């Protein structure tokens, strides 16, 4: 590996999901002012984030799918004849 091109502050950081409280330890260069003591006894820099894969509806399976096919059919039934020439 080339020397001098990698960040000096690449270290383990705790990312805390504010919506459900989950915590993840990930290596990062993010600059933080807060720290947190984890269960392993070490103190890590803390970064609070609004949403993660632990709380995002796409990843948790709570995603709502909208049925747009009915709306398109209703639109075409109402206005589909307007664009056609007789």
From Swiss-Prot:
Ribosomal protein is among the record's keywords: yes
Record text on subunit structure and interactions: Part of the 50S ribosomal subunit.
Gene Ontology CC terms: ribonucleoprotein complex; ribosome
Entry keyword set: Ribonucleoprotein, Ribosomal protein
Segments passing through the bilayer: none
Family assignment from sequence similarity: Belongs to the bacterial ribosomal protein bL31 family. Type B subfamily.
GO molecular function: structural constituent of ribosome
PROSITE patterns listed in its UniProt record: RIBOSOMAL_L31
Gene (UniProt): rpmE2
Origin: domain of life: Bacteria
Biological process, per Gene Ontology: translation
Protein name, as recorded: Large ribosomal subunit protein bL31B
InterPro entries associated with the record: Ribosomal_bL28/bL31-like_sf, Ribosomal_bL31, Ribosomal_bL31_B, Ribosomal_bL31_sf
């Amino acid at each position: 590996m080339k020397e001098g091109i990698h960040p000096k502050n690449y270290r383990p950081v705790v990312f805390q999901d504010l919506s459900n409280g989950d915590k993840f330890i990930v290596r990062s260069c993010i600059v933080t002012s807060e720290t947190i003591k984890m269960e392993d006894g070490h103190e890590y820099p803390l970064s609070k984030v609004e949403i993660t894969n632990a709380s995002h509806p796409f990843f948790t399976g709570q995603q709502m799918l909208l049925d747009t096919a009915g709306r398109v059919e209703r639109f075409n039934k109402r206005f589909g004849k307007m664009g056609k020439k007789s």
